[in-house]
C-alpha cells in the first residue's frame, strides 16, 4: 500500500538557503527521496550534495497540505 511521505529540508550553496517541504504518495521512502532530489535539482539547478534533508516523516491523509497529492488521494 502507498505511503504519504513529507520531506523537509533546505538547499544550500545558493545566495540564501532555501527551506522547503514536499509531499509524495509513494511505496517506499527511498522513492520519495529520489523524486525530491530529481525535482529540486531540475527546478533550482542544484546538485544533490547541496540539498540537505532535515526530516522525513510518514503522514496521514488528513495532514496532507499539497493540493495535487490531496486530489490524487481523493481519486482512489
From Swiss-Prot:
Keyword rRNA-binding assigned: yes
Molecular function via GO: large ribosomal subunit rRNA binding; structural constituent of ribosome
Cellular component terms (Gene Ontology): ribonucleoprotein complex; ribosome
KW Ribosomal protein (keyword) present: yes
Source organism superkingdom: Archaea
GO terms of biological process kind: translation
InterPro entries: Ribosomal_eL20, Ribosomal_eL20_dom
Keywords: Ribonucleoprotein, Ribosomal protein, RNA-binding, rRNA-binding
Pfam families hit by this protein: Ribosomal_L18A (PF01775)
Complex formation: Part of the 50S ribosomal subunit. Binds 23S rRNA.
Family according to the record: Belongs to the eukaryotic ribosomal protein eL20 family.
Protein name: Large ribosomal subunit protein eL20
Amino acid at each position: 500500500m502507498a505511503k504519504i511521505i513529507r520531506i523537509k529540508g533546505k538547499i544550500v550553496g545558493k545566495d540564501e538557503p532555501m527551506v522547503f517541504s514536499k509531499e509524495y504518495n509513494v511505496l517506499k521512502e527511498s522513492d520519495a527521496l529520489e523524486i525530491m532530489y530529481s525535482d529540486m535539482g531540475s527546478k533550482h539547478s542544484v546538485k544533490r550534495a547541496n540539498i540537505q534533508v532535515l526530516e522525513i516523516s510518514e503522514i496521514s491523509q488528513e495532514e496532507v497540505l499539497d493540493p495535487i497529492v490531496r486530489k490524487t488521494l481523493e481519486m482512489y
